[in-house]
Amino acid sequence: MHRITILGATGSIGESTLDVVRRHADRYVVHALTAHRQVRKLADQCVEFRPARAVVGTAEAALELETLLRDAGVKTEVSHGEAALESVAADAQTDSVMAAIVGAAGLRPTLAAARAGKRVLLANKEALVMSGRIFMDAVREHGATLLPIDSEHNAIFQCLPADDPRYGRGVARVLLTASGGPFRTRDPATLHDISPDQACAHPNWVMGRKISVDSATMMNKGLEVIEAHWLFGAPAERIEVLIHPQSIVHSMVAYTDGSVLAQLGNPDMRTPIAYGLAYPERIDAGVTPLDLTVAGGLHFEKPDLVRFPCLGLAFDALRAGGVAPAALNAANEVAVEAFLGGTVRFTDIAGIVRQVLEATPQGPADTLEAVLSADALAREAAREGVAALAAKR
């Protein structure tokens, strides 16, 4: 039996992972589950899957979870805090770690899994955005296996040469597709009135609120560009973003002989999750098969960087290198949180990120301390930007 730990079990990726595991109880056993504060949902998962360990964010949440599990007769060991997250990610009793904690909070436990030589199913893009070189070095030095779970990077992985899924070997370009989000055709002059609920109403995918906003601004695609650079070794000028509203073609790889290989499928995260869990085999993911006669036309267009300035900022950060991507990510997390909380407007997000990038001192991202220091400075600068905008409203 293959033993799995899921970091971020109560989020959309975590729940989809458990759905795939549920379909293949003869192959997989859940060793550990983690969540930050959705204690009751985590308790329900523990009752069903009986993991050996569970980790939550705070002592209060741990006490609540222990009570719920004791009442249910479940003997899962409960712990809390960052150190417990890192411990469970590196646990010798687990084989694969699904890294699905959203944002910078997922960096340390994901890095711990890599350093423990685990099979890392990477759904947390921030680990590579913030500390790409550190993370990839850890994977190589400790013999970890890294499998991308983001639908786009999973698609690229499938389209690259199987024996060496890296840029080179006749690869001309990496083509990342993007739906364009809910505001692809909306008049840019009206975007300042967008509500959080409107921004979270993605036309094709079911996602959490933060990543839904990132999709609406296309910052999500910008972070994926940086992630693709580190995963596949592709330089910025060889990574291209195409808007594809149908979300059927998940990404493509163009080769020097004129060939373009694409991975297609219905928009359902269980497909890349199942691919990562079973690699190099294939298993049923529970996804409705794609019927191209029903899907209709497939359309592609270049992104409008006036409508989507966050995408351009991400390319700028990738080209700048060093701690710039960490600052980009930190500023975006603060700005999106402020937007979801009603403190700033949708159109303020890009401005806050740009201001922070311009103010962040440049430096190498060669140590985790340097990355986390840049992250902290960028968050403080972003909070100041949010406060200044809020004072004007």
Curated annotation (Swiss-Prot):
Annotated binding of 1-deoxy-D-xylulose 5-phosphate, by residue: 125, 151-152, 179, 202, 215, 220-221, 224
Catalytic activity: 2-C-methyl-D-erythritol 4-phosphate + NADP(+) = 1-deoxy-D-xylulose 5-phosphate + NADPH + H(+)
NADP in keyword set: yes
Pathway(s) annotated for this protein in UniProt: Isoprenoid biosynthesis; isopentenyl diphosphate biosynthesis via DXP pathway; isopentenyl diphosphate from 1-deoxy-D-xylulose 5-phosphate: step 1/6
GO aspect biological process, one term: isopentenyl diphosphate biosynthetic process, methylerythritol 4-phosphate pathway involved in terpenoid biosynthetic process
Superkingdom of the source species: Bacteria
Upper lineage: Bacteria, Pseudomonadati, Pseudomonadota, Betaproteobacteria, Burkholderiales
Matches recorded under NCBIfam families: Dxr, PRK05447.1-1, PRK12464.1
Homology family: Belongs to the DXR family.
PANTHER family, per the entry: 1-DEOXY-D-XYLULOSE 5-PHOSPHATE REDUCTOISOMERASE, 1-DEOXY-D-XYLULOSE 5-PHOSPHATE REDUCTOISOMERASE, CHLOROPLASTIC
Leading EC class: oxidoreductase
Function comment: Catalyzes the NADPH-dependent rearrangement and reduction of 1-deoxy-D-xylulose-5-phosphate (DXP) to 2-C-methyl-D-erythritol 4-phosphate (MEP).
GO MF annotation list: 1-deoxy-D-xylulose-5-phosphate reductoisomerase activity; manganese ion binding; NADPH binding
Name recorded for this polypeptide: 1-deoxy-D-xylulose 5-phosphate reductoisomerase
InterPro entries xrefs: DXP_reductoisomerase (IPR003821), DXP_reductoisomerase_C (IPR013644), DXP_reductoisomerase_N (IPR013512), DXPR_C (IPR026877), DXPR_C_sf (IPR036169), NAD(P)-bd_dom_sf (IPR036291)
Binding site for NADPH: 10-13, 37-38, 124, 126, 208
Organism: Cupriavidus necator (strain ATCC 17699 / DSM 428 / KCTC 22496 / NCIMB 10442 / H16 / Stanier 337) (Ralstonia eutropha)
Gene: dxr
Stretches of the chain forming a coiled coil according to its record: none
Keyword annotations: Isoprene biosynthesis, Manganese, Metal-binding, NADP, Oxidoreductase
Names of the cofactor(s): Mg(2+); Mn(2+)
Sites where the protein binds Mn(2+): 150, 152, 224
Listed transmembrane segments: none
